[in-house]
Regions:
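Residues lining hydrophobic/aromatic ligand-binding pockets adjacent to catalytic sites
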Residues: 83, 97, 105, 111, ...
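Catalytic cores of alpha/beta
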Residues: 52-54, 60-65, 109-123
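Active-site-adjacent beta->alpha loops and helix N-cap segments on the catalytic face
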Residues: 34-42, 80-93, 132-142
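A positional/architectural concept
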Residues: 9, 13-54
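Structural preference for beta-strand elements that scaffold enzyme active sites
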Residues: 28, 49-51, 72-74, 101-103, ...
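Acidic (Asp/Glu)-rich catalytic clusters
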Residues: 40-47, 61-70
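Alpha/beta catalytic cores of nucleotide-metabolism and tRNA/nucleoside-modifying enzymes
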Residues: 4, 99-101, 110-112, 124, ...
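Short beta-strand/loop segments at the ligand-binding rim of alpha/beta enzyme cores
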Residues: 45-52, 91-104
Length: 174
């Protein structure tokens, strides 16, 4: 799949490994979450080039202790109406201050591109169904932000996190 970073198509240096592929002699690999512990134990300390594919059903807290050793985390959008990857990306980038690459994969369209950028995603595995121009045009097509905390000049570093409630702590009706 094509990769978009900084509004440009780029070559993808990353290899996605499955549950059984060997890590030996490889670099720039993304492993399934189920293999992360194994990969970390085999990966030389201080060696870069390791990433994890975070299922949308997983909690970011499952990988927080390993973020310093990861260069990329992929978040998955298995369906257009499944927005859990937005929350995962936001948590990685803004709550846990992950400085590596966050890549979106799966079923999303150019209309979602600006919101994914606002959530902290900076790399995209995109469908060939749309042109690069269509993706880039959408990057600035939404004049308002999805949440006011993402507005220019009102970065999350100024938000009172101590007073914020997680989604699970908020009252829900219905």
């Amino acid at each position: 799949m094509p990769i978009i970073e900084n509004h440009r198509l780029v070559n993808d240096p990353w290899q996605h490994l499955d549950e059984t592929s060997s890590l030996t002699g490889r670099s720039m690999v993304i492993v399934p979450l189920a293999r992360l512990e194994e990969a970390l134990s085999e990966w030389p300390t201080g060696h870069r080039g390791l990433g994890v594919d975070l299922p949308n059903s997983a909690r970011v807290d499952d990988i927080v202790q390993h973020l310093a050793r990861l260069d990329i985390v992929t978040v998955n959008l298995p369906a257009f109406n499944d927005g859990r990857a937005f929350s995962q990306a936001r948590s990685l980038r803004h709550t846990h201050r992950f400085s590596g690459t966050i890549r979106a994969r799966g079923t999303f369209i150019p209309d979602q591109y600006p919101m994914l950028l606002q959530a902290g995603v900076d790399s995209f595995e995109v469908s060939t169904r749309f042109t690069l121009e269509e993706w880039v045009a959408e990057a600035h097509a939404v004049p308002a932000t999805y949440q006011r905390d993402y507005a220019a000049g009102a970065g999350l570093s100024t938000r009172p996190f101590a007073e914020a409630q997680s989604w699970a702590e908020q009252p829900h009706y219905g």
